[in-house]
Amino acid sequence: MNLASMLPFLDEEGLQILVDGLIDGSLTDISLGEILHFLEDEQIKELYNHYAAHPEKGVSTTIFFPFMDDDDVDKEFLRQFADGKINNEMLPFVSDEALHSIVEQYVANPDWNLDIDDLYPFLDDDDLTLLLKAYLKHKSSAN
């Protein structure tokens, strides 16, 4: 039996059985890449949370980002940011609003020792200008 061929025909209950099997380790003959397209947002979040909490399982959480709900991506990115980490792998999937929030926090604390250079390609023009103005203001006040 080829589980991947069955995926498009499974209902939510069947997909949840597969999710549970991936989490408890009893299901090893299907990959996350095969199943993620078919899952509901909550199931994707459940799998993401499981693998994020168990890095020893060797699953890169990057695989989840294209499939996660936009709000969930933003929440996770902002949570990691609050812990002092910028997850570069998430950047293409983070909303402009979440990035703007980070820029505002960064500008409000110019002495923050956090490297945000990797954000530049993902920021809109207004946020880049805001960063530039804050940098120039901080630089002139330091002199």
Question: Residues of each region from the PLM?
Answer:
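General marker for long, soluble alpha-helical cores
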Residues: 1-143
